[in-house]
């Protein structure tokens, strides 16, 4: 059983109290693709406020559920969906779509969890490549003949009558004869070797070059000889390719240590579990593995791409890697990955801020250094790397504490890019990852910046939270690198307020968790559940309730006087976009939130903290970030926040 250090008694002694640590609040489910969403007409939404159960008008709820089902039916399948939905076949199925791409589906002996890695590619008809085998099991289409970078051979185009199919077969037969002559000629002149063996698989990618499905991008296998971790290697083209090397010993030493479904086979220890996967600490105590929760490799793609960009940009700026090249500028980056097991490796830390047990007034100076360092990391990530973190929470700040005094934080880093999105100007849609393991090139999903897809509901900046209360599917207002950076810093301000309440409340962390934090996370959990159900009206209602909880948290630290202006601006906004009675309902729910999140037990330590330089630094930056309620506030200088 854990114990919690309580505030010193009057006689100077220290007491201990048993603690039952609740699990960390989960974040929203994975963001939806752009094609999963439809534009909604702007309507005046009647804010419910105080309805904690999320009850909404039935007619409105039905309308939105119908919209969600329509959206789901109209969703365009991804390449992975095409493969997983297709029955296993022994021939090549290739169809030409309206977007100018040929969708090539290849059969292989891989499991569904492995098959999505390569067996379906979007192949440009003009100047790209057809991959005719699976790099994992080396099986695939054996009778596909390739010429001039186009998909040919026994590919059947769906549609048409039998006569047209006969004509196509005759034309294909003539094409095959011509292709055989050209291929034999190319082989004799030193080109790609061609074989008429019907059991041999063909691919344009070989031991020397990886030809990608993206026009103008060629990647050479020899590039991997000089790199050991994911790194960005710019070639002057319109692409930002991150090369991810692979060593066979990675699986032997790391993947297999995590073991299978039987816990007895594992040497690793499970230290974290959430919506996006599991985190394991290996037996060396220095390495952690994050295994994705789903078969999709999108999160692995995003993680290794951001890690490569951060590593490259940091080295260019003169930063040196720490902890085996796993930390740059207080950002935790991946040191390796395995697509077969869909996981990435990092350096291991003691714990995260949410599960940290050493909060104490004596550690105030170290907490200031920690938040200042995380702010530097967010500025570097947004302004130098072109990446918005969009998930700044206590659960995503990892720390090592001082072994001599666990009340002091020795090191803090930002981690977890599950909700991150790229905003590199001029290169959106051109961020690609080159994998040595499969000799393939894959692109990151395009960024959409939908407000419901970014940030944990409990720590979402207020100017975005209020927009979600009216239009949950609204996109980020006037996106830019500066605005994204300020938004991340505002989320960091809410995290600082959350942690400072733990430090200053003399009732101890156990009582804070069961009162103030429960009031905040209780509504946040309902918001996540509503997001999973795609219930737009419930999401809007719970976001409006979260605003009052976030303001109440801030008020316990700053006092009522500082809350008057942001409260007045929010009331004016709700009256304009909703109805004239909305401000009264908002004030009523805010008063109830103030009673639930009680700051009366913080008065003594709060006054003491306000008289110290470290305490004033934290309080001033909480004031600068947690009271931003208008989207225009995002245009401030990010270097003036947590400087």
Swiss-Prot record:
UniProt region (Disordered), positions on chain: 1-30, 52-97, 155-199
EC number from the UniProt entry: 2.7.11.1
Active site annotation, chain numbering: 391 (proton acceptor)
Protein localization: Virion; Host nucleus; Host cytoplasm
Region of interest: Nuclear localization signal: 25-49
Sequence ranges assigned to domain Protein kinase in this UniProt record: 265-643
Outcome of swapping residue 47 to A: Complete nuclear localization
GO biological process: symbiont-mediated perturbation of host cell cycle progression; viral process
Observed effect of gene inactivation: Deletion mutants show a loss of typical nucleocapsid clustering in host-infected nuclei.
Function, as annotated: Serine/threonine protein kinase that plays important roles in several processes including viral morphogenesis, nuclear viral egress, viral replication or regulation of host cell cycle progression. Participates in the acquisition of tegument during virion morphogenesis in the nucleus. Phosphorylates host SAMHD1 and thereby counteracts its antiviral effect by reducing its dNTP hydrolase activity. Inhibits host DNA synthesis by cyclin A/CDKN2A sequestration to the cytoplasm.
Protein name: Serine/threonine protein kinase M97
């Amino acid at each position: 059983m854990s114990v919690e250090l309580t505030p010193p008694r009057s006689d100077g002694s220290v007491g201990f109290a048993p603690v039952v640590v609740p699990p960390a609040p989960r974040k929203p489910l994975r963001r939806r693709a752009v094609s999963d969403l439809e534009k909604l007409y702007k309507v005046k939404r009647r804010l419910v406020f105080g309805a904690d159960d999320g009850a909404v008008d039935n007619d409105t709820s039905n309308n939105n559920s119908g919209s969600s089902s329509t959206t789901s039916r109209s969703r365009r399948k991804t390449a992975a969906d095409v493969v997983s939905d297709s029955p296993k076949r022994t021939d090549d199925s290739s169809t030409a779509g309206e977007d100018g791409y040929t969708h090539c589906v290849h059969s292989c002996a891989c499991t569904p969890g492995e098959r999505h890695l390569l067996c379906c590619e979007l192949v440009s008809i003009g100047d790209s490549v057809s991959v005719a085998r699976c790099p994992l099991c080396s099986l695939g289409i054996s009778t596909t003949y390739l010429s001039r970078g186009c998909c040919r051979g026994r590919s059947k185009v769906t549609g048409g009558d039998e006569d047209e199919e006969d004509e196509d077969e005759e034309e294909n037969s003539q094409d095959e004869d011509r292709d055989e002559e050209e291929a034999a000629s190319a082989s004799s002149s030193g080109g790609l070797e061609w074989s008429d063996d019907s059991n041999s698989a063909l691919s344009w990618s070989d031991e020397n070059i990886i030809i990608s499905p993206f026009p103008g991008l060629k990647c050479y296998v020899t590039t991997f000889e000089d790199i050991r971790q994911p790194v960005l290697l710019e070639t002057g083209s319109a692409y930002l390719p991150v090369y991810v090397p692979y060593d066979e010993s990675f699986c032997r030493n790391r993947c297999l240590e995590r073991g299978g479904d039987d816990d007895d086979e594992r040497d690793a220890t499970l230290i974290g579990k959430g919506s996006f996967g599991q985190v394991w600490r290996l037996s060396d105590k220095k390495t952690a593995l994050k295994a994705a929760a789903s078969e999709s490799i999108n999160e692995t793609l995003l993680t290794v791409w951001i890690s490569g960009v951060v590593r490259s940009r940091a080295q260019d700026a003169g930063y040196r890697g720490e902890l085996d090249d796993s930390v740059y500028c207080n950002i935790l980056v991946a040191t390796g990955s395995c697509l077969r097991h869909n996981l990435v490796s990092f350096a291991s830390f003691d714990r995260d801020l949410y599960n940290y047990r050493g909060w104490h007034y004596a550690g105030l100076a170290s907490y200031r250094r920690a938040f200042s360092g995380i702010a530097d990391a967010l500025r570097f990530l947004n302004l130098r790397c072109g990446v918005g973190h969009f998930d700044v929470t206590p659960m995503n700040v990892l720390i090592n504490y001082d072994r001599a005094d666990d009340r002091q934080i020795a090191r803090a880093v930002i981690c977890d890019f599950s909700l991150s999105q790229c905003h590199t100007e001029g290169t959106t849609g051109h961020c690609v990852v080159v994998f040595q393991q499969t000799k393939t090139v894959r692109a990151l999903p395009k960024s959409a910046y939908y407000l419901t897809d970014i940030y944990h509901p409990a720590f979402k900046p207020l100017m975005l939270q209020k927009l979600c209360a009216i239009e949950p599917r609204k996109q980020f207002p006037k996106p830019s690198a500066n605005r994204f950076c300020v938004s991340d810093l505002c989320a960091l301000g809410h995290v600082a307020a959350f942690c400072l309440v733990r430090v200053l409340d003399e009732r101890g962390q156990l009582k804070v968790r069961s009162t103030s934090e429960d009031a905040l996370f209780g509504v946040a959990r309902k918001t996540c559940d509503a997001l999973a159900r795609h219930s737009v009206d419930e999401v809007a209602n719970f976001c409006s309730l979260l605003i009052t909880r976030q303001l109440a948290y801030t008020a316990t630290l700053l006092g009522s006087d500082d809350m008057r202006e942001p409260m007045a601006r929010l009331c004016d906004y709700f009256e304009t976009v909703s109805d004239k009675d909305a401000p009264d309902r908002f004030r009523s729910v805010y008063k109830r939130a103030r009673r639930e999140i009680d700051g009366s037990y913080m008065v003594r330590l709060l006054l003491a903290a306000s008289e110290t330089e470290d305490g004033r630094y934290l309080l001033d930056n909480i004031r600068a970030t947690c009271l931003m309620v208008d989207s225009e506030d995002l245009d401030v200088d990010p270097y003036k926040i947590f400087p």
